[in-house]
Curated annotation (Swiss-Prot):
InterPro entries: LS, LS/RS, LS/RS_sf. GO terms for cellular component: cytosol; riboflavin synthase complex. It comes from Idiomarina loihiensis (strain ATCC BAA-735 / DSM 15497 / L2-TR). It holds the Pfam family DMRL_synthase. This is 6,7-dimethyl-8-ribityllumazine synthase.
Length: 154
């Protein structure tokens, strides 16, 4: 039986991180978690990380598509926060962000890690951006590191 697993060292690989400005007070913590994880665990150099800031989560898929089509990156990481409000807006934004990023991953055969927190409350979002429930930006970066190495073996 053959088992394929990916390590997390990705020295020399290039990563793009798409960062939503909406809910920036917690999203910056997600970005910091992603960058620190890439550098510390993946041994990725500063020059191999590109940060692209966009207005919100809805703009992430088209940005990811442009980054993927450039051929410059080994993986893309999306970090942001969408918090439920009193209207259906949450479902539209979160759903389009999730499905759009997934389409980019499959269309371009490229890891696109989802570090966009989608929560019912502000407190839940804060917990997932570096306090009680860990840092989803860091977790997304670990996923990207591993998937770069898994796909390299396939």
């Amino acid at each position: 039986m053959q088992v394929i697993e990916g390590g997390i060292n990705a020295a020399g690989k290039k990563f793009a991180i798409i960062v939503s400005r909406f809910n920036h007070f917690m999203v910056e913590s997600l970005l910091d978690g992603a960058v620190q994880t890439l550098k510390h665990y993946g041994e990725v150099a500063d020059d191999d990380i590109t940060v692209v800031r966009v207005p919100g989560a809805y703009e992430m898929p088209v940005t990811a598509k442009r980054l993927a089509s450039s051929g410059k990156y080994d993986a893309i990481i999306a970090v942001g926060a969408v918090i439920r409000g009193g209207t259906p807006h949450f479902e539209f934004v979160a759903g389009e962000c999730n499905s759009g990023l997934g389409r980019v991953a499959t269309e371009f055969d490229l890891p696109v890690a989802f570090g966009v927190i989608t929560t019912d409350t502000l407190e839940q979002a804060i917990e997932r951006s570096g306090s009680k429930a860990g840092n989803k930006g860091s977790e997304a970066a670990l996923s990207a590191l591993e998937m770069v190495n898994v796909l390299k073996q396939l």
